[in-house]
Amino acid sequence: MPKEKTHINIVVIGHVDSGKSTTTGHLIYKCGGIDQRTIEKFEKESAEMGKGSFKYAWVLDNLKAERERGITIDISLWKFETSKYYFTIIDAPGHRDFIKNMITGTSQADVAILIVAAGTGEFEAGISKNGQTREHILLSYTLGVKQMIVGVNKMDAIQYKQERYEEIKKEISAFLKKTGYNPDKIPFVPISGFQGDNMIEPSTNMPWYKGPTLIGALDSVTPPERPVDKPLRLPLQDVYKISGIGTVPVGRVETGILKPGTIVQFAPSGVSSECKSIEMHHTALAQAIPGDNVGFNVRNLTVKDIKRGNVASDAKNQPAVGCEDFTAQVIVMNHPGQIRKGYTPVLDCHTSHIACKFEELLSKIDRRTGKSMEGGEPEYIKNGDSALVKIVPTKPLCVEEFAKFPPLGRFAVRDMKQTVAVGVVKAVTPRAANASAAGKKK
């Protein structure tokens, strides 16, 4: 048996018309899980609708439409492979909940592909103050996406000019550096997602470019380390009652290892029970590791005791607990007015969805250095501001420090049906043990 290829999760970011769908569609089309029949169907429909030239974006638009209509489509369609890795596109902007998904996303992106359009005016619109390019770069950095590849797209529209490519590279590099990335470690690839230049094969139209193709750049990313050595953390997505088996919580292992026989403690309530068995895709597992989506059977607990948003951990190894309050670095991205103390939006953190109060605005933060700015407590914060905030949940909640457990330490601040801010947890005040252990069961 050949060793299975390493899985890598990608998020595709960039301004609205930069050509993300076309580029992504092209990769899936050429290296991915779409069979010939589906492609022919798409080509035919595309021609019938007068789209004339078959656009790769068509692939993605169809998948997206099916996804949004709630048709569960084969997730393999969002996968493609290279000689080294299996890639899964975990999200692409254009989905209504893109930003929320990126934060609470069941999986952390290992690498971001930033697509920028080279066209005159197009690039400038994307990188302008209200363009999405900056927002997405900032988001990726805040959420701990360490690796990035930049695709300078639509090179065909500017006659493959090197000067324009260099100009864009210079400007994006400056912004990446300001955000905290090291641009020297980021490959910039001039591409045409539509014509196929430098996507998979080196382009004959750009003899001046000596770097890797987009696929080549993807092949040279560093595989992520999966955090098996950390204590167990498994946020629950659902809890099922299955006749003949009992109570089955379901979720994704974020850190650590779950084995049958483990005494599992659930936060924030503190109830605990032995894990009897674990299943993934209807197959029994001897252990579940980070990245595994599993169901596991617990004794003596009902669906009233545990619910979505709870966090399962090992009772004997630094178990998760509920929090009284926590301090977080919050970046305001999309709020129409001023946020003052007392503001109580909904926070989406891992699988939980709970109203939380901004108890105190502690200080503004200089985004370049990450340090608190002079001037003490701000009266309010607004779009573009980064601040240290003390947050109090209105109901029991379990969060962790981002530095220790990243997936449990990132959150989206939701208000008016949109993501108004993002944050990472810096410090947590745990709830007193006796307050939560009253309902303990074995």
Curated annotation (Swiss-Prot):
Cell location: Cytoplasm
Domain tr-type G stretches: 5-228
Region (G4): 153-156
GO terms of molecular function: GTP binding; GTPase activity; translation elongation factor activity
Superkingdom, natural source: Eukaryota
Region (G1): 14-21
Main location: cytoplasm
Region (G3): 91-94
Alphabetical list of PROSITE patterns matching this protein: G_TR_1 (PS00301), G_TR_2 (PS51722)
Region named G5: 192-194
Binding sites annotated in the UniProt record for GTP: 14-21, 91-95, 153-156
Classification via CDD domains: EF1_alpha, EF1_alpha_II, EF1_alpha_III
Family assignment from sequence similarity: Belongs to the TRAFAC class translation factor GTPase superfamily. Classic translation factor GTPase family. EF-Tu/EF-1A subfamily.
Family matches, as PANTHER family: TRANSLATION FACTOR
HAMAP family: EF_Tu_A
NCBIfam families according to UniProt: EF-1_alpha (TIGR00483), PRK12317.1 (NF008969)
Role of this protein: This protein promotes the GTP-dependent binding of aminoacyl-tRNA to the A-site of ribosomes during protein biosynthesis.
Listed name of the protein: Elongation factor 1-alpha
Organism in which the protein naturally occurs: Entamoeba histolytica (strain ATCC 30459 / HM-1:IMSS / ABRM)
